[in-house]
């Protein structure tokens, strides 16, 4: 009788685990994560996202941890229950055999213990693919397209396309600098002979894959590049590297994408889109791919402003081509320099330790 009760308890525990995980699976990964201290604890250090894609990834991250903890508690509970219920010392006191009843040929139990892990793995795989597809989808109809070029050890940002309502010209804006782009195209092949080089026979100095724009923001050792973007607007990023591999990473996007040289030859998807940035402010961006001596200092800033301010900013840049990015930021009432990170002198000849230029952040 006692053995039957124990077997019934184990079966109920297993059934409870199946029902519990099934409920989580049906809930889906896009259910909002818990808020407050509990949500912060379950986030395990992840920042709160500022895009819908980031929110989906954050929710998935949190619910995976919730599922893992539930499974862990169930398994720990069964382990502790078995440890105390079927101990040799307890069996000896009760005058029973040292070993409990063996269940190695309990077909229903073995089926449950095989099927449940398969369901868990399949559910996690399903929600992983679901979240990944949402994050990498190229279906946002971007109103702003930004060309991003990484190089040792800084960034260049250019506005390739801007929709009419945000454009400095009042109509759809195409920002390609045709003259510089044509010059880059000429570097594709060496002049006056065959090209015995490994990149499909192209010149080692080929820069034709890079994009050049009329309105650009270029980072220097004295000034962090500030990329100005509108809030609540679909944005597309087009990435490339001018030298070694880099990676474009904004922690609040909860997403990073590698920037390669010759991305097409490397079979890389160089573009990604976000539906909108939901919060205005300054957000630090970083290189997330080890790229040499000053990799850790290769920062930039995303400055998110209202669509109205963004249109004013672009108009100022378009009407004043000689003005600096800091001048344009001042013109719309924004801090002229990066506020989320500071410049670092990345010149290889710097050896005196004077790596911080306090005048640039003033």
Swiss-Prot record:
Signal peptide start and end residues: 1-28
Keywords tagged on the record: Cell membrane, Copper, Electron transport, Lipoprotein, Membrane, Metal-binding, Palmitate, Respiratory chain, Signal, Translocase, Transmembrane, Transmembrane helix, Transport
GO molecular function: copper ion binding; cytochrome-c oxidase activity
Chief localization: membrane
Membrane topology note: Multi-pass membrane protein
InterPro entries with a match to the protein in the record: CcO_II, CcO_II-like_C, Copper_CuA, Cupredoxin, Cyt_c_oxidase_su2_TM_sf
Polar residues composition-biased segments: 197-206
Bias type Basic and acidic residues, positions: 176-191
The record's free-text note on cofactor binding: Binds a binuclear copper A center per subunit.
Enzyme Commission number(s) from the entry: 7.1.1.9
This protein's record includes keyword Lipoprotein: yes
Residue sites binding Cu cation A1 per the record: 246, 287, 291, 298
Gene3D superfamilies: 1.10.287.90, Cupredoxins - blue copper proteins
Protein family according to the UniProt entry: Belongs to the cytochrome c oxidase subunit 2 family.
Protein name: Cytochrome c oxidase subunit 2
Gene name linked to the record: ctaC
